[in-house]
Amino acid sequence: MKIKITACQFRVEKVSTFHEFQEQVEDLITQVPENSDYIIFPELLTIGLSAAFGEQDASSVIRIDEYTNQYKDLFRSLSRKRKQVIIAGTHLERRENEYYNIAYIFDEDGSVVEHKKTHIFPAEANWHTSEGDELEVYSVGRVKIGIAVCYEAEIPEISRILSVNGADIIFCPSYTFTEAGFWRVRHCAHARAIENQVYFVHCPTVGEPGSPLPNGYGRASILSPCDSAWPANGIVAEAVMNEHTIITGTVDMDELYENRKSGAATTFKDRNRRKGMYAKYKPYEGLK
């Protein structure tokens, strides 16, 4: 079974109305092939809307929550119209008295499931966002998928839990502020693809949302394990750095399943094979 994936590398800029933001989204999505099974947008792609509130400090970025209903309505409409699954990046939303960085997955009928980012990057602390406590594998579209938002790709346990619970593709919307930050997430994303024998789709926010918010830096990619079934470097598709653009690639699920059985490096099953040895060391005991 072959799955076509499109990553929309979104270039944020200051916008003063939701209509301007919507035009940016539609500019990219109209370039997406009609037969793509999954479309992904990056983390906090709505952050340029913070300019609508005038000069402010970084902590006031949470005010973009005021656009939550319009944001959801837009992507619900697009998923229904296009009959495609859309991972609509992430957006800051208020739930009771707390704000969460939430990834929304819209099925082709407009229904939605969500994932609250579980590990907040240290620099995000200034935005006063809270952390989610759940990891879930979603049966949305033709395969089972998981979400690892940016910094979550740097926490190996996240992708391991998702993969052992059935996720074959992990989607990673991200927003990194520096070249080093981009490569940190990218290298970790590829490590997760190799060690769990999954496909990993990394989709970063790029552009300039305006002071005091940091610029986005990155290059979208569709990543595979490094083995004979795929390009030697494990890159199925890759975008131009820091451009407002899309990439599309096709991944073969049968090749992935066969690779787990008989690939050169069968890391998915071999990690379980020695779990008795790992248990001796109780890695989380003594952590403070």
Predicted regions and their residues:
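Short polar catalytic/cofactor-binding loops
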Residues: 9-15
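Extreme N-terminal starter segment of soluble prokaryotic enzymes
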Residues: 1-7
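CN hydrolase (nitrilase-like) catalytic-core segments centered on the catalytic cysteine
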Residues: 67-85, 154-243
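Structural motif
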Residues: 37-38, 145, 169
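Active-site catalytic loop in hydrolytic enzyme cores
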Residues: 94-165, 178-191, 265
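C-terminal beta-strand edge segments of enzyme domains
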Residues: 137, 206-288
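Cys-nucleophile CN-hydrolase/nitrilase-fold catalytic domain and related Cys-dependent amidase chemistry
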Residues: 19-108, 177-191, 195
